[in-house]
Structures are given as structure tokens and as C-alpha cells.
Amino acid sequence: MSRPEGGKADAKGTSNLESGHSYPLRETIESIVVAVLLAFLFRTFVGEAFIIPTGSMAPTLQGNHKDVTCVECGYPYQASASSENDDLSYQETVGATTCPLCRFTMPLDLDLDEERQRFGLPTDREESGRAAKTDANHESFSGDRILVSKFSYDLSNPRRWDVIVFKYPNNAKQNYIKRLIGLPGETVRVRHGDVLIKPAGENDFRIARKPPHKLVGMLQAVHDTHYRSPELAEVGWPSRWQPGIGDGAAGWRTVADDEKLELPQADGESWLRYRHLIPSGDAWFKLLDGDKSVIPQPGATGGQLISDFYAYNAFTTVRAERDHDSPVPTPSVLGTHWVGDLGLEAEVTTTGNTGELILELVEGGVHFQCRIDLATGEAKLVVVDERLQFVDDAGQAATASPKAATAVRGGRRHRLRFTNVDDELRLWVDDSLATFDGPTTYVSPEDCRPHWRPDDLGDLAPAGIATHGASAQIERLRILRDVYYVAVSAELRSDSEYTDGTSDLAAVQMFADPESWSTTNLFARRRSVDFPLGEDQFFPMGDNSPQSKDGRLWGDPPYVERELLTGKAVLVYWPHAWSGPFRLPIPNVSRMRLIR
């Protein structure tokens, strides 16, 4: 009978044999202990994972939410589900959401017919036509899972516009996540949607400008020609891109089933201008009932101002103890503040190697243009108003028309992005930021408000694209807006930015009444609020400003001490998995991203 090598039946051999068996076990135990210690050290000193519970940072980061795709225009977006709860005495379910592009209020795939009946919706989904079909992804999902770097601020100081995690000053056991706005020693002013900063020892405020990569990450979609509602087209709802009044843009036409815009001939400047022609919830109901009386005529007064609408906030709920909840969002979530800081994106192909391509944005009645020479690629910025001029950081007048070399050439296809945000003009060509030979910054007037005249639509047509001496085909157009920070504070005991408590409905109605913009005192009643900071004090705000409980509303103290900072949010590493028949734990890889 053979024995294992080294397996002698003596004390020494037995000891060696037992040692040979126990070593792997001991190694395993030691490895587990080391792994636990490393994980503990990593969590304590290097990084930690968090789940976002609320939507105060939406749409940058998602709290508890629903992922939906609009059944009318096909646009994918998220809506809050943070209000849902399991309290049987006060059950609440998100039953409908509103698309940020076409504004269709879409009933979700509710499990119970009685819940659909509370919305006045057909229980036979095939019969309803507009109700979302059975979709497992209409269930509620937990928030984004993010990774937070704990040592970032050991190596360098926190920077403005970072997304930070910290301990809530009034409850150090609770973690908060916001965007860092104010730094130690500064006074932060929130005014007209912008952030202004007064550094320690200085007397004047200056606007805080977002770095380019932060700006791109914070812009929110208002319109996209890739997402069109067939229903609106069928009933004759006017396109949001219209010839400008007196611009002679009759040459523009749609091609390829209205998917593209084309200008076959180009004599002089030929303009297309954006009009914010969005159907209200009531208009949608009437259109679906066959009532076309609500269809607007663009004319000189059709459309409205762009507001701080958040799809994340525009949801309606079904409550167990109520017989009926209106599926139409209330005015408070339709956006009650005018947003003048906008961006225009265009995918365009020009023919020939002469002429100009012109991009335009309007704010406060001032026309800001970027004119690109199709022969040389030179881009030139122009302010079509004598009231404003470009200035440097010291406030001194700068080059009247700064120029930049770009890769744009006639006969090629390019992706262009032109923004007017934080009193600064920027241009991207094929995702590359153009560098101008002078400052592209300016100072807005204190009383900046929307302007309109019959011969100059101003802020009623806040974006435009044109050719001069050239022809072009446009494959895609997008309108984007900046975050609007609402000027409220705990001391004011009001969630309204307007000093006289103007109703949400009154503000929304005024946005659609351009003939009254010059006489109304609505825009003069916008308040500003200040927040002074001391040494090692930081001021945070959420990107979802209307629904964010942040430094503005904490009361005392309205800031975060340095010792309460946990770290910098750097990565969304595990967005929720898409639900399906097998419910595999596979994350939505397309939404894994660095946090900007």
C-alpha cells in the first residue's frame, strides 16, 4: 500500500502532513482579513460608494426615479419617484410624467386598473392609444450609485462647481450631495438665475462662470429635431423653426420626411429662428379629442419664453385616499422663471467654399452672433447692440469682434455648439472648443429682461441659424438651457423668487404675452439673496434648484464647514439595470460616466 510522499506515521511526519493541510486554510483566512482591512482602509481614506436618494442634483444625478420614453416624440428622460412610499395610510404612486420636449403628459404602466381610472384613463391600453404599453422599466428605480474620492481635498482645495458629498450641518449622520458654489471668505449672491461672487476684501460682485466641461455637462435639453411628435405634425402644429419676421427666409424647406432642413438657394441672409411653441397639457387633451382650435399661429406673437422646466419635477401622483388626481402638471412645475442663458447645437453641411454660416442667440433683446467664414473657417463674434461690448476680467473694453480659427469649411459636415451662458460666448466645432483672440465675456445690464417688438421678435425667437451667400442642409438642431438658480432663502420664508409672491400661473401666462413684457413689473420683482462665508466655510446648491434643499434653505448655518466635507463625487459606476423578463443584474452601461 503506497502512501503520500512525506506521509510517514511518526510525530514529525504527522506534524508535516497537518501543516500541509492547514496552510491553505490559514492563507485563506489571512487573505480575507487583509481584504477586509484594505476595504476598510479604502472606504475610510480613499473612496466610498453612495446611492443618491433624492433628485436635488437632477438631471446631473438621479435620485429615486422612473426611466421613461415619451410615447409621442420618443425622447428618453427621467422623472422623480422620491415621493412614492409604502405607508398604507398615505400611499402615493407616480402615475404620469411630462416630456421636457413635446410636453406630452404620459400615463405610466400602472399595475392596477383602478389607479388608471383615478387619472380618467382607459383601462384597455390597446383602446387608449396614448397610454404607455406594458413596460417593466416604468417601475421605480433607486438612485445612481456613485463613487466618492475622499482624498481629493487632502491633495488640493475644493474647487467651485465640484460635485461634493458632505455631512449635513444640522445632522452629521446624514450625507448630502450638492454642487460647490461658494468658497471660504466669499459672499455668494444668487440673482436672476446666476451666481455672483464677491471675494474677501473686495467691494464688487462678479459673475461666476462655469468651466467649459462643467457647462456642457450641466446644459439641459429644451428642443431636439430628432424627437418629433407625429401627432403634432399630423394635426398641423407649427414647427418650432420658423422664418424670421422680415428675414426673407422662404428658401428654407424640409426634406427627407421633415427630418432635415435645406436651403437650396442662398441670396443674402436667409434665417431660421426658434420659437418656443409648446402645447400645454390642456392643449394636448383637446388635440387628442380632435379639437384643433388650440393650434397656435406663429405670427409676430406666437410662442413663449423658455423657462426652468424640469421633467424630473413634472410628475403627477395617484393617492390611495383620493378619487381623482389631475394628470396635468400644475403651473409650479412648468417652470416659473425665464431662462435667457441658452445654447444652440447644429449638425450642418454646407455646399461650396464661399459665404457665411451664422449662429445667433438672443438674451434681453440683445443679439449675439457667431459668423463663420466658409472659405477660411474664421469664426467672428458680434454683439448686435451698442449697449454691450466685450470686456476683460478687469472690466475694460476689449476687442469688438474677437476671432478664432476653426476647422469649418464649405462642403463639409460639422457639429457646432454656440452658447451664451454666464455672460460669456463660447463656440465648439466638432466637440473642440474654439480659442478666440480676445475676451468673449461681457456684463449684462442690471435690469436684464425679455424684449419684443413687432419688427424684432427678440426673446420670443431666442435662437437662429442662417446662411449668407451659401446653401446648407441641417440634419439636427438642439436648443439647450443653463441651470437657473432660484433666489430664495430660509429667512424669507417663501419658495418664490418674486418679491410680491406672484402666483406660478401668473408668471407662466406672462411668459406667453410678449406685448406685455415692456410694461409688466414681473421681471423687476425678481429678488436677489446674499450668503456671506467665513474661513473654512463652503456654500452648496443643487442642480435641481426649484426642488433642492441646500444652503439657501438651511437657515443657520447656511454653509458647510471644511471638517464636514467627505469628498468629491467622481463617477457614476452602477446605474440601475434595465428590467426585462429575466431581471439580470446588468447595469445601464451607457449611463456610466464621470461626474461633471
Region annotations inferred by a language model:
Residues 1-596:
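Extended hydrophobic leader/signal-anchor segments used for secretion and membrane insertion
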